Amino acid sequence: MIINARSFGEIEIEKEDIITFPDGIPGFEGLKQYIIINNPDEENPFQWLQSVDNGDLAFVIINPFLIKPDYDIVIPQSAIDKLKIEDKKDVFLYALVVVPKKLEDMTVNLSAPIVINGKEKLGRQI
């Protein structure tokens, strides 16, 4: 499957790599399918959560433990149920990065992480 992403041009993705956000992401509730695009520079910790439905929408994300090694979050039982999480090894956490015009003003949202069940390919911002 090929999608046209504004920041990346045409990229080929596999259907099995698509992560479904059943409720969308707050502010983008109508967009439910995303893929994670890894940074080609392995030294760069940023990745992208690219909408499959809208090529113009991609969120910069980062592993929150790279920012705050003692990061601790409790995933509500309702999210565990909706994401069909059965084993914590299937859970991946990401934080949204806010990238303003002045890069030195960049912030990371540790209060509302993205939780992904890698086994079921389901995601949710909590």
Label each region the model flagged.
Residues D70-I75:
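Extended catalytic/binding region for NAD+/ADP-ribose chemistry, centered on the ART fold
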Residues Q77-D87:
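Short active-site loop/helix that positions an aromatic residue
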Residues I2-K68, K88-I126:
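Long, compositionally biased stretches
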